[in-house]
Amino acid sequence: MKVIGLTGGTGSGKSIVSAYLKKKGAYIIDADQIAHDIIKRGMPAYEEITQYFGGVILDENRNILRKKLGSIVFANKQKRDFLNHCTHKYIIEEIDRQIQQEIQTQKHLCIVLDAPLLIEANLQNRCDEIWVVFAKEEVRARRVMQRDNITYQDAKNRIGSQKNWQTYQQYADFILDNSKDL
């Protein structure tokens, strides 16, 4: 079964492409959703993250405030590297589990691994093809601000924390330009 790696910068429109492919019969592995799930209370990454960052990222029920955590890590490379180091192993483990399960069941036309950090996490070796969704930086910043209800500077920090366009191009088998509003 073909595994398509779907990647691109934040705000490029990966989720829209992913939703379209799902309608067409693809099985979607959403790395962002996995990342959200593995930092919940009771999960191994939760303990590592809360020990490192402390109570400043927790709400009154001791749940991780993802927006607060994001504002910290997207402004500080060392803290972002720590977060990636402690979460990627759990994310990759779950991605591998889902790929193997879907290969065994063969219920879909293909597998789409929707992963913004596909290259950074070295997940391209799990894919038969790499599809990169591209959008101009200003378009991406506007989308991220609207989607996440954050400031322009926070959006630019998130965009700046990812690989540049030339890096994505080097890995791309297909490039989808999503610079226009849908």
PLM features per residue range, with description:
Residues A26-K40:
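Short beta-strand-centered segment that lines the nucleotide-binding/catalytic pocket of NTP-utilizing
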Residues R97-C110, Q124-V133, E137-Q153, N164-L182:
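NTP-dependent small-molecule kinase module
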Residues S12:
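ATP-binding Walker
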Residues S15:
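Walker A/P-loop
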Residues G9, L21:
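P-loop (Walker A) phosphate-binding loop of NTP-binding proteins
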